[in-house]
Amino acid sequence: MTNRDEIKTKLRDNFAGRIVRKDLTKKIKEGANVPVYVLEFLLGQYCGSDDEEIIEQGINKVKKILSDNFVRPDEAQKTLSTLRSKGFFTVIDKVTINLNIRKDRYEAEFSNLGIKEIPVSEEYPEKYDRLLCGGIWCIVQLEYEYDEEDKFSSPIKIAKLNPIQMPHVDINELKEGRKAFTKNEWIDVILRSIGMEPDQLNEREKWLLLLRLVPLIENNYNLCELGPRSTGKSHVYKEISPNSILVSGGQTTVANLFYNMGKRTIGLVGLWDCVAFDEVAGIKFKDKDGIQIMKDYMASGSFARGKEEKAASASMVFVGNINQSVDVLLKTSSLFDPFPVEMGTDTAFLDRIHCYLPGWEVPKFRPDHFTDDYGFITDYSVSYTHLRA
């Protein structure tokens, strides 16, 4: 039995239903407009076998579930019309549950369907606590019944709700399963879980790819990665974790990033585990004090707005391209050359970066760098990165 086969056997024995063959994700993702973590959860449920016939049946089952039940935002009204005419309909959507204190009841909000204040049984938030913490994707059986005598109540009712993301986090399950693996085996599992094939990487390259995950795990960790194109610098923050956001290069504002004083609402740093800036060369604040506020936040995890001081835990990541060799760059300028001048030459800003990941040491990705083997379903692995230190 090869090392890969041993790892696969250990994964099946200790994490059944939590793993997926990563090539299946690529196979369906091309034609499915759903988050990777939702897709992989379904694949983990229906395609956890080595039997190609069972896998094919599972793929067809997942495709049918998505085509029949996934709600596209532009088809929300069509779905609601079908629900009204049939009296029942099953949908896949991101559901958030809030406690309405005034009415002393729990209410559900559907992201793509665009409806909210739908009464829901308290058994669901008690059973699946992530519904209360930003919401999770679910498959929901809806019923429609209009009551002439009570025109103010919602005609839409939730008959049944099943999460298609990890509904809660059991750290003890992970700890127990981890004991079956050596350190090197566990590193390979993590890399395959983010879609990479460790057999195509040397030891140094493995650790550099793992380093990209640190801002998702640590609070207030500031990372910079500059390097050639096609090395997947922004992929982790865009596709791998639902708890991070990728801000494309361009103008941003203090209100958007930190705190909106008009609306009295926290910005991105208070809503996400990690805020990543793509193409650092284009970062520009509309506000004159934007960079100073960013430096304060990077140093202490807090910032002042008006009379108040706000704290947040989001890590910051800066990624960008270096279009010339490192040797030339060092002779003519510095390794921070791609940054805007007001950031790249400000030693106070540079001192606040905890780690510079040398992107030129990461190989340009070829098809064989992407794994076809088993790894954790994305939502399972990121559930634990969300338990931040």
Specify the residue positions occupied by each region the protein language model found:
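Extended, charged/polar low-complexity intrinsically disordered regions
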Residues: 2-193
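Helical mechanochemical/support elements of P-loop NTPase systems and associated helical scaffolds
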Residues: 182, 186, 286, 290, ...
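Conserved ASCE/P-loop NTPase catalytic core
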Residues: 190, 197-328, 333-337, 351
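A short helix-turn-beta junction within AAA+ P-loop NTPase domains corresponding to the substrate/partner-engaging
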Residues: 331-359
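C-terminal structural cap/anchor segments
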Residues: 356-363, 377-380
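Short acidic, Gly/Pro-enriched loop/turn segments at secondary-structure junctions
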Residues: 362-372
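Extended alpha-helical interface modules used as scaffolds for assembling large macromolecular complexes
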Residues: 372, 380-384
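Conserved small/polar residues in nucleotide/adenosyl-binding loops
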Residues: 385-389
